From Swiss-Prot:
Subcellular location: Cytoplasm; Cytoplasmic vesicle, Phagosome
Annotated protein name in UniProt: Cysteine proteinase 3
PANTHER family: CYSTEINE PROTEASE FAMILY C1-RELATED
Tagged with keyword ATP-binding: no
GO cellular component entries: extracellular space; lysosome; phagocytic vesicle
Function: Cysteine protease which may be involved in pathogenicity.
Gene for this chain: CP3
Signal peptide region: 1-13
Length: 308
């Protein structure tokens, strides 16, 4: 009898926790069947969080890991062991850098594999503000619809999209070409800014990445974001997972700085999963930790920008 009472009490407590979580994250379920399914997924993720430090029941706690991977990444390729691509110039860099103050709030790619567009607009927005003192919000949807060198919601790469912006004579504003999270027909809008050149560095040097960020501003970087621990990342912690791969890139994010605290050295990185995930859309990643998640393997940034 006691065991039955305990079971019922735990079940009730779990459902209360789920309802509180759903209210916090404005979750609405289509019907009772979906509610029960998401509740079951939530309980599975709750067990994972209870067994793994530095994780939490965040906005993605009602998604299976398979669903998460299918809908929230957007770069899939392997960095070879050797590469002929250019290396970063390694110079003495400041102890810490933080470009968050020149950036827009983190955006949300939704259930579309368009991370490559968000890291591209982020580095363009950051560089324009850094060099020209103007903060714009550029159109990710224009890249999804118009950049034929990439694959819209099926993935892409910032090296391609930065070249597209240069060859297309710029990119328009988000307000003129708003984000839909689905691929559509390319539309013509007024372009506002362009890149005059871009660079891709794949040498794997974290010290080199520090120099790039310090000198050039925010950098679009590839990483392995496929671990369950990253899906359920706990804000304020320095992310580290020994099973995170250093050469298999599947997500593009924006490195905006680096620093250290009592828990270790870290990179400051802006994601494209909205402001409800992480720390207002940002996360800290272990730095000088054998290229954690491949952070230094694929860096992309504009070498110059101009207004049109």
């Amino acid at each position: 009898m006691f065991a039955l009472i305990l079971f019922v009490s735990l079940a009730c407590a779990n459902e209360v926790a789920f309802k509180q979580w759903a209210a916090t994250h404005n979750k609405v379920f289509a019907n009772r069947a979906e509610y029960l399914y998401r509740f079951a997924v939530f309980l599975d993720n709750k067990k994972f969080v209870e067994a793994n430090a530095n994780t939490e029941l965040n906005v993605f706690a009602d998604m299976t890991h398979e669903e998460f991977i299918q809908t929230h990444l957007g770069m899939t390729y392997e960095v070879p062991e050797t590469t002929s691509n250019v290396k970063a110039a390694v110079k003495a860099a400041p102890e810490s850098v933080d470009w968050r103050s020149i950036m827009n709030p983190a955006k949300d790619q939704g259930q579309c594999g368009s991370c490559w567009t968000f890291c591209t607009t982020a580095v363009l927005e950051g560089r324009v503000n850094k060099d020209l003192g103007k903060l714009y919000s550029f159109s990710e949807q224009q890249l999804v619809d118009c950049d034929a060198s990439d694959n819209g919601c099926e993935g892409g790469h910032p090296s391609n999209s930065l070249k597209f912006i240069q060859e297309n004579n710029g990119l328009g504003l988000e307000s003129d070409y708003p984000y839909k999270a689905v691929a559509g027909t390319c539309k013509k809008v007024k372009n506002v800014a362009t890149v005059t050149g871009s660079r891709r560095v794949t040498d794997g040097s974290e010290t080199g990445l520090q120099t790039i960020i310090a000198e050039n501003g925010p950098v679009a970087v590839g990483m392995d974001a496929s671990r369950p621990s990253f899906q359920l990342y706990k804000k304020g912690t320095i992310y580290s997972d020994t099973k995170c791969r250093s050469r298999m890139m599947n997500h593009c994010v924006t490195a905006v700085g680096y620093g250290s605290n009592s828990n270790g050295k870290y990179w400051i990185i802006r994601n494209s999963w909205g402001t409800s995930w992480g720390d207002a859309g940002y996360f800290l990643l272990a730095r000088d930790s054998n290229n954690m998640c491949g952070i230094g393997r694929d860096s992309n940034y504009p070498t110059g920008v101009k207004l049109i």
